[in-house]
C-alpha cells in the first residue's frame, strides 16, 4: 500500500523519480506511518513541492526485501528511507553495509538523544540512523491492588528485585494475585534485567556468553525465584499476557513504554494505574533501574538519489524539532526519545488514565539513564535460549544443564 503526503506523486516503485520526493518504507498506519506523514507535512511548509511517498511495509518485509536486494547485488529496489527495529538493525548493517548511507555529515546534535538509543544505529562511532520512538522500560502497577495488600507506588520505586520479591510474595498471600506477568519463551523480562546492568548474553566479541557470565546467572537465579515464589506468573503467549493484566490477575507489568497503549484501552481501569522505575538487580555494581525494550529508527539507504535532502528532512523533524514531537504525540501516540521534547508543555500534561501522572516527560527522562551494553545480531535467538532455560529449570532441570544447553544452542544458532 502506498500513500503520498504533502504532494501528489504516485508511487510505482521504490524510486519516485522526483528529486523533491522521498520514498519511505514503514509499518503501522496509526503510529509510524502517521508520524512520517506529519513529518512530511511539517517539512513541506518551508520546502515548497516536497513530499514523502510512504509504502506500507511490515517490519518483516522490510528485512526480507533488504536481504533479497543484497543477495541480488541490486539495491535499486530500496526506498530512500527505511524504518527498522532497533534490536534487528545491527544484524543487517553488519551483513549488508553497502545498503545504508552513513550520517557523518548530518546536522544533528546527537547528545540530544540517550546514549543507548544512539548506539543501536551506530558502528565504529559512526551514526547510520535517526532515532525515532522511545523504548524506555517502565513498571506499571495497579494501585488499587497494591493498596489492598498495604503498599503504595513509593514502595515499588527505585527498589531492587529482592525487595520486589518480598513485596510480591506478601501481595500474593494477601490477594492471590501476582505482582508481575511474563511470557514464558517469548517474554523480555530477563533481557530487560540484563540490559539494566549494561550486560548481555554475548561477550564483547559477540560470542555466546551464558555459562560463566556472573550477571547472567544472577538474573536467571532471580527470575527463577520470582516464578517459583508466585511473584511472576509465566504465561504461554501474548494474548494470555495481556489477559492477566487487563483481567486483574497481575498487579504489575514491566515492559517497554509502548505497553501504555494496551493499558489505556481498558477504560474501566482509568486512574488505577501508575508508572515508575523497574527494579534493579541486587549485588551488581553496574545495575540500574533503567532498561530499553523496543523502538525503531530511520535509515537512509544507498539507493537514495538525494541524500542531502533526506538528511535535512530527517534532521529538521525527527532529529531536532520539539514542535514536531509535540504534534505527533496526541495523534500517533509516538513518544519521543529526543530528550528536549520531554521538557515541553505537551509532554508534561497530566494523564488522567495514569492518575494525573505526567508519564510522557517521565518516560523521556528514563531514556536518558539507560546503560549501554554489547549488542548482538542474535538478540531474539538469545532471548529464546535463556527463556527456554528458565522454563526448564522451573520444571526441574538442573540449572547447570539448562544453562549449558542454552549456551550451546545459542552458539549453534550463531553459525546458521
Residue ranges and their predicted role:
Residues 1-23, 45, 404, 408-416:
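Short, low-complexity disordered leader/linker segments with a strong preference
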Residues 18-29, 50-55, 80-81, 128, ...:
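Short, well-ordered beta-strand elements
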Residues 42, 46-115, 148-150, 251-252, ...:
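Extracytoplasmic "Venus flytrap"/periplasmic binding protein-like
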Residues 83-138, 162-167, 192, 197, ...:
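Hinge/lid segment of periplasmic solute-binding proteins
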Residues 90, 259-270, 282-385:
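C-terminal lobe and pocket-closing loops
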Residues 126-132, 137, 147, 162-209, ...:
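Extracytoplasmic/periplasmic solute-binding protein
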Residues 147, 153, 344-349, 361-416:
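Conserved C-terminal helix/tail region of periplasmic/extracytoplasmic solute-binding proteins
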Residues 166-170, 206-235, 278:
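Glycine-centered hinge/linker elements that transmit conformational signals in sensory
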Amino acid at each position: 500500500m502506498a500513500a503520498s503526503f504533502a504532494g501528489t506523486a504516485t508511487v510505482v516503485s521504490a524510486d519516485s523519480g522526483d528529486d523533491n520526493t522521498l520514498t519511505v518504507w514503514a509499518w503501522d498506519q496509526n503510529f509510524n506511518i502517521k508520524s512520517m506523514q506529519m513529518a512530511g507535512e511539517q517539512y513541506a511548509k518551508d520546502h515548497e513541492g516536497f513530499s514523502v511517498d510512504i509504502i506500507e511495509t511490515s517490519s518483516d518485509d522490510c528485512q526480507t526485501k533488504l536481504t533479497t536486494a543484497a543477495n541480488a547485488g541490486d539495491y535499486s529496489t530500496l526506498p530512500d528511507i527505511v524504518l527498522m527495529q532497533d534490536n534487528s538493525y545491527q544484524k543487517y548493517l553488519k551483513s549488508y553495509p553497502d545498503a545504508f548511507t552513513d550520517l557523518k555529515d548530518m546536522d544533528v546534535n546527537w547528545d540530544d538523544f540517550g546514549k543507548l538509543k544512539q548506539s543501536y544505529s551506530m558502528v565504529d562511532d559512526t551514526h547510520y540512523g535517526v532515532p525515532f520512538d522511545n523504548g524506555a522500560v517502565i513498571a506499571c502497577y495497579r494501585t488499587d491492588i497494591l493498596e489492598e495488600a498495604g503498599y503504595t507506588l513509593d514502595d515499588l520505586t527505585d527498589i531492587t528485585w529482592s525487595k520486589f520479591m518480598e513485596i510480591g510474595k506478601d501481595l500474593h498471600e494477601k490477594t492471590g494475585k501476582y505482582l508481575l506477568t511474563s511470557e514464558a519463551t517469548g517474554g523480555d523480562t530477563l533481557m530487560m534485567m540484563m540490559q539494566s546492568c549494561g550486560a548481555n548474553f554475548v561477550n564483547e566479541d559477540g560470542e555466546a556468553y551464558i555459562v560463566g557470565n556472573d550477571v547472567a546467572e544472577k538474573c536467571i537465579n532471580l527470575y527463577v525465584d520470582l516464578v517459583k515464589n508466585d511473584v511472576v506468573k509465566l504465561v504461554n503467549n501474548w494474548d494470555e499476557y495481556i489477559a492477566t493484566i487487563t483481567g486483574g490477575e497481575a498487579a504489575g507489568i514491566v515492559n517497554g513504554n509502548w505497553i501504555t497503549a494496551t493499558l489505556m484501552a481498558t477504560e474501566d481501569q482509568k486512574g488505577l494505574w501508575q508508572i515508575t522505575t523497574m527494579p534493579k538487580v541486587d549485588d551488581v555494581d553496574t545495575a540500574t533501574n533503567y532498561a530499553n525494550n523496543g523502538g525503531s529508527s530511520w535509515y537512509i539507504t544507498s539507493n537514495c538519489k538525494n541524500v542531502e535532502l533526506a538528511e535535512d528532512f530527517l534532521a529538521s523533524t525527527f532529529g531536532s524539532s520539539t514542535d514536531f514531537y509535540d504534534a505527533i504525540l496526541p495523534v500517533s501516540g509516538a513518544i519521543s526519545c529526543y530528550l528536549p521534547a520531554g521538557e515541553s508543555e505537551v509532554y508534561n500534561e497530566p494523564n488522567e488514565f495514569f492518575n494525573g501522572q505526567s508519564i510522557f516527560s517521565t518516560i523521556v527522562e528514563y531514556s536518558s539513564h539507560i546503560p549501554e551494553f554489547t549488542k548482538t545480531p542474535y538478540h531474539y535467538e538469545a532471548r529464546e535460549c535463556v527463556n527456554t532455560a528458565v522454563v526448564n529449570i522451573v520444571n526441574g532441570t538442573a540449572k547447570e544443564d539448562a544453562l549449558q544447553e542454552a549456551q550451546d544452542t545459542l552458539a549453534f544458532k550463531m553459525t546458521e
